[in-house]
């Protein structure tokens, strides 16, 4: 397993890679050093509003239902939002469970759980370092770039 951290326009990002595929991307700093120039460049392009879709080889680690939810989340387009309830209906579970699975997302930005909000229009939670403040920042970035 390779791990690296780097500073981006969104702050420190930590990435973990196994068998040449990303399985974890999170906000925060790690002490390990590996070259992830391609990922760093893509995140900075995203943060500048110049990249809407990541071209990164990754995989999910989780239960079949978690994987189904994350696959559904990955379909949410840049600048769009959906609700926990709508995702829940598509995969046959509860909105609360969808929220819990979003909180376990290890591929932040790549699997855009920040694009999922409550049915009343409130943001809900966000597991990335920085919480709701960061979720607002990401949604604002995407809304302003369209």
Language-model features, listed with the residues they occupy:
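Acidic, glycine-rich catalytic loops of TOPRIM or P-loop NTPase phosphate-binding modules used
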Residues: 106
């Amino acid at each position: 397993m390779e791990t690296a951290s780097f500073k981006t326009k969104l702050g420190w990002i930590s990435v973990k890679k196994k068998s040449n595929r990303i399985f974890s991307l999170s906000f925060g700093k790690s002490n390990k050093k590996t070259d992830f120039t391609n990922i760093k460049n893509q995140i900075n392009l995203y943060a500048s509003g110049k990249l809407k879709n990541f071209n990164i080889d990754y995989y999910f680690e989780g239960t079949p239902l978690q994987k189904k939810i994350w696959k559904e989340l990955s379909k949410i387009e840049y600048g769009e939002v959906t609700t926990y309830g709508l995702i829940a209906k598509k995969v046959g579970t509860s909105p609360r469970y969808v929220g819990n699975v979003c909180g376990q997302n290890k591929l932040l930005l790549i699997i855009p759980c920040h694009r999922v909000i409550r049915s009343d229009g409130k943001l809900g939670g966000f597991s990335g370092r920085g919480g709701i403040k960061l979720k607002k920042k990401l949604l604002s970035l995407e809304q302003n770039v369209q």
